[in-house]
Amino acid sequence: MSDISKASLPKAIFLMGPTASGKTALAIELRKILPVELISVDSVLIYKGMDIGTAKPNAEELLAAPHRLLDIRDPSQAYSAADFRRDALAEMADITAAGRIPLLVGGTMLYFKALLEGLSPLPSADPEVRARIEQQAAEQGWESLHRQLQEVDPVAAARIHPNDPQRLSRALEVFFISGKTLTELTQTSGDALPYQVHQFAIAPASRELLHQRIEQRFHQMLASGFEAEVRALFARGDLHTDLPSIRCVGYRQMWSYLEGEISYDEMVYRGVCATRQLAKRQITWLRGWEGVHWLDSEKPEQARDEVLQVVGAIAG
């Protein structure tokens, strides 16, 4: 697309970053100044009843800056990148029609990628194929199926953990149905995002600072009642660790503690470590992202001013 045709597109802002980097605080600050409406880009914040462990914006913050695509699914329900793209595009169109600018804020990089580049057409789920895969897993274990995926699609296997049955099953299902690997099919993009996008990423200047922020926030969550929140989910009886919601960082570790598998101290240690690993993956995504303007979490006023300098003109 030419620069001239891009300039004629409606405007949008991406505010990306690892967990605990200060994205939400910056987005709320920007909403006070720019004619923007916020859309959450987070695969965990979609779930109702999962507030403390997800660092969901509180009632006061949401009053100051409402976020779209929060609390739209029960923890028992799935939500895909395709679901997100459909919903986000609808929200963006609604915001643009009202004469305002969509500001998409979050850390689920797969969602940002799906929105920006579009999604390749993948085969629909096949219950028979899925049942066959699950039967094989029951007989041989998911480790065996992961080795099978490594043989046909090493790129996907490197990205999918052996203990992630949902994604592992889907990758094998796609191959069995289509004869093509998930990697092959996802290299074919769908429709690009019909917006002129200004992209920002916020993170502390050093990994050590980010690790400190992550540990502090995890302890703040515990002090705010995170255990009670997960106990309420645990008591429902219909949730389990094969669900994406319960596999979320922090929730998975607290679930193991409630099941008596690990001690409280071990839960805290694993929760912090898992959050650090998540942040590392998010930063790895962003380091390879084109056209990103980096902001420093430790200098929030400067970060705000840099965003205003880049996008302020579009609000005039």
UniProtKB/Swiss-Prot annotation:
- Which parts of the sequence are marked as the site Interaction with substrate tRNA? 108, 130
Lineage: superkingdom: Bacteria
| Cofactor(s) required, per the database record | Mg(2+)
Catalysed reactions listed for this entry: adenosine(37) in tRNA + dimethylallyl diphosphate = N(6)-dimethylallyladenosine(37) in tRNA + diphosphate
- GO annotations under biological process? tRNA modification
Name the residues that bind ATP: 17-24
> Which positions bind substrate?
19-24
Q: Which SUPFAM superfamilies match?
A: P-loop containing nucleoside triphosphate hydrolases
Sorted keywords for this record are:
ATP-binding, Magnesium, Nucleotide-binding, Transferase, tRNA processing
Annotated stretches, region: Interaction with substrate tRNA? 42-45, 166-170, 247-252, 280-287
UniProt keyword annotation of Nucleotide-binding present? yes
Q: Name one GO molecular function term.
A: ATP binding
Entry's NCBIfam families? miaA (TIGR00174)
- Quaternary structure note: Monomer.
Q: Which family does it belong to?
A: Belongs to the IPP transferase family.
User: What does the UniProt record say this protein does?
Assistant: Catalyzes the transfer of a dimethylallyl group onto the adenine at position 37 in tRNAs that read codons beginning with uridine, leading to the formation of N6-(dimethylallyl)adenosine (i(6)A).
Q: Which protein, by its recorded name, is this?
A: tRNA dimethylallyltransferase
> Species name for this entry?
Shigella flexneri
